[in-house]
Amino acid sequence: MKQIQPIALTNDEALVLQQITENGEDDVIGLSRGLSMSRSQVAKQLDRLRAKKLVTIKATCGDLWVRASKRGRQLVRYMWPEMAPAY
């Protein structure tokens, strides 16, 4: 497996990425509830994660659905090797 370059994540970014990876896919409202963060906080973290190419965001029927990108899944496996992904 190709090694990924070190990526700096804040605690909130890491929590959001971990939650998305555990769920396989989630919407902003579900993430907000699951993480006990406001929607604006979640949206801010998602913008940062998308800029780092760790998540993909798809707009459908007024909702934003988020998935971890391949790079994001690799990073989660590196950070939490014991975690079993949902996909």
Regions flagged by a language model, labelled:
Residues 18-22, 80:
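Short, locally clustered residues in the helix-turn-helix/winged-helix DNA-binding domain
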Residues 62-70:
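Minor-groove-contacting beta-hairpin "wing" of winged helix-turn-helix DNA-binding domains
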Residues 50-60:
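A short, conserved structural fragment
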Residues 1-2, 73-87:
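Amphipathic alpha-helical dimerization/coiled-coil segments
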Residues 36-51:
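Short amphipathic alpha-helical interaction segments
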Residues 18, 29, 47:
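Residues within the helices of the helix-turn-helix
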Residues 1-16:
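Short alpha-helical segments that sit at the start of domains
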Residues 25-34:
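Short acidic, hydrophobic short linear motifs in intrinsically disordered regions
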